[in-house]
Every structure is written in structure tokens, then in C-alpha cells.
Amino acid sequence: MARNKDMNRNAGSREAFKRAALGAKNNAYELIAEFDPEYFSYLKGLYVDGTFGSQGALPRKTRELIMIGITCALNRPRGVRLHIQRALSLKATPREILEAVEVAAIPGGLPGLWLGAESLRDVLKAQGRKFQ
């Protein structure tokens, strides 16, 4: 009974994650929602409500560009790819994304630069686009 209540409560949280994802696929959210609905609810509060779902001084596109730089510097391929997809959906140009990747090379080193450049190429190719 309690599990059904948790699943119903998290239905709205799942939809909020999907909206915040801007079409970028990340099935890990569904797993966390299934395995630990209570934690998923807290995660939604931090990630969706507090970071990417709220309006603040920085536009969402700028936040995504920052996340690209951070995930490159930390060498997180999945995060780099997801945030590139989201930035593109928010009308970031490939040049803006590349500059976020290049800035990340200072604190993160060349492996982050290579990761970001390759990820940008791969995402653009998957979308049938070219770097311009």
C-alpha cells in the first residue's frame, strides 16, 4: 500500500524530470524512482525545482553551458552528452558549446577538452547537423 502511494506521488516528479531533461534521454531517473521513491522525491527537489526548473538570474541555456564545462572538467561522458543535447535544444550554437568545452580545459585538462569535442561531434552527427 505504501509503495503504491510512493509511486503515485512520484508520477508528478517523473514528469517534472522529463520536462527538465528537454528531450535528452536518461533512463537512470526511472530506475531511481522505482528503487527508492522517497530519495527520488528529494532529488527532484534539488535538481528540477532548485537548479534547472527554476527561473533565476542565469537563463537555462547558460546553466546548461556551465554544466557542459563542469562535466567536461570532471570527465563525465554521460553528463557531457546530456547537457550538450539540452543546450542545443535551448538554441545554444555549436560554437557556444565548444567555447564552454574549451574553458573547461583550463581546470580539467586536455582529456576534458577531447571528451567535450568528441561528444559535441557525436551529438551533432546523431541530430544530422554539422559544426558551424
Model-flagged regions — what are they?
Residues 103, 110-111:
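Substrate/cofactor-recognition hotspot
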Residues 63-71, 100:
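Short, structured motif recognition centered on aromatic/hydrophobic residues
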Residues 85-92, 108, 119-128:
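Short alpha-helical linear motifs
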Residues 73-98:
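Mid-chain, well-packed structural core segment of small domains
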Residues 17, 71-72:
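A generic structural signal for short
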Residues 60-61, 95, 108:
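Aromatic- and histidine-enriched alpha-helix N-cap/loop-to-helix transition segments
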Residues 1-62, 115-132:
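Acidic, glycine/proline-rich low-complexity segments that act as flexible tails and inter-domain linkers
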